Amino acid sequence: NAAIVTYDYALSANSQTIQFVALGETKSLQIVSTRQKKVNGKPSGGVEKVDTTAQITGTGFSQTSSETSNGENYSIVAAENKAETDNNGSITITQTESNKTVNVTLTQLAAAVTYEYTCTVDPTTLSFAAAGETKIFGVTATKQKKVNGSNSGIPSAVTYTTTVQGEGFTKGSSEYSVVAAANTGAQRTGTAVVTTTEGNKTATVTLTQLA
């Protein structure tokens, strides 16, 4: 009788899921792809390597491969994820002769969204006449959105409140005005502290009124 020749195929990956950081990175996937020749059901010769192909899906994922002694090493690249949701994909490895497949899930974390707050005043000192008067000052209160640590868009304005302290000084009709009452005594001082409603940033205007 003629000998019956068959092959036992094996295909495996060293990971079922690969996770990537939002900034993007490269990770390795090791594939073992082999066949064992059998004659009349018994192993004949050594284990042989079998080629594989890869199909990758998902936004921002790509791959390159290099040969190993018993399969292939796939280098999987995830580009930066700037979305505020996780980025998902997959890579399917197919063994060329047997059509066996192994599927590996690719997950990438959502972008890290933070805000940087600023609060400045101009000028930082105000001087008032002894007779009393109202003065205004400039306030810049903003927030800058950052995605993965880099600026996204332009700064936007945030609201703020002002607290005035010191004898004879009160807040005026707006959050950026100070009223000094008439001073009949020695020189006096106070402060106007501006605080952003988001981010809790502060800036201080020093107030002085002449004797």
Model-derived features with residue positions:
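Surface-exposed or flexible loop/turn and strand-edge residues in extracellular/cell-surface modules
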Residues: 15, 26, 88, 101-103, ...
